Design a protein with these regions (language model features):
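Structural signature of nuclease core domains in nucleic-acid processing machines
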Residues: 1-226
Length: 226
């Protein structure tokens, strides 16, 4: 069988794989239908490679497979919506920091940074690239600004700083920080505080984090904000 924690990992991996497939697609191709079709093919590939046919041999396994597929389709819809509502576009997925990775020049303050960020988006404005980092989550963890000020829960912000510092070495372009976010990709819509299932779905589809207060960045993040 597949545990719920394994299902979360599956949805996370499917969302990342979908992102790699749509790199370079024109905006007109980012319809819900087109992105869902790409996700369906991604789910089929991952299901065969990671889970296998044994999952479908009993009722619970078939239920779990349906749930994972539904969660993946919702993640695909949300991803497409994030791109359509603004001007940021994916620059890469599972971007690595440290020796032998995409951003090897990741030493900050004498400390060598090593790790990965799930997704990097870029908004190109003249000769400057505005960057945002996005961490895919299957739980309900949210960035904690107070915690960041106190020196904990700073992982996303450290990656963003290192990304902007290393960007000119990799791309030859100047970079500025635009934001750091969690993207909740789970399928868990318990009615929270009476808001209702649909309200929770809409809320879960948002990028949850902090955005630079530059009007250009706000407009590029969501055209309805400014």
């Amino acid at each position: 069988g597949v545990a719920l924690s394994d299902a979360g990992i599956f949805v996370h991996d499917a969302a990342a794989a979908l992102g790699r497939k749509i790199l370079g697609l024109r905006d007109a191709a980012l319809t819900d239908e087109a992105v869902e079709a790409l996700m369906d093919s991604t789910v089929s590939e991952l299901m065969e490679r990671q889970v296998g046919t044994a999952l479908l041999e009993d009722g619970r396994g078939r239920w779990m497979a349906r749930r994972m597929s539904a969660a993946c389709r919702l993640a695909a819809q949300r991803f497409a919506r994030q791109l359509r509502q603004g001007s940021f576009r994916p620059a890469g997925f599972e971007i690595g920091f440290g020796s032998g990775k995409q951003f090897p020049h990741s030493e900050r303050g004498g400390i060598a940074l090593s790790g990965f960020v799930d997704r990097v988006d870029v908004f190109r404005n003249g000769d400057c690239d505005y960057l945002r980092v996005i961490d895919y989550k299957t739980g309900n963890k949210k960035p904690d600004l107070a915690g960041a000020k106190d020196g904990y829960q700073v992982q996303l912000w450290v990656y963003l700083i290192a990304l902007c510092a290393g960007w000119p070495h990799v791309t030859g372009r100047t970079a500025r920080p635009a934001g750091a976010y969690y993207f909740i990709v789970q399928d868990d819509y318990v009615d929270d505080a009476g808001k209702g299932v649909e309200a929770n779905r809409a809320e879960a589809g948002r990028l949850v984090g902090l955005t630079c207060d530059d009007p250009r960045v706000l407009r590029a993040t969501d055209r309805d904000l400014v």
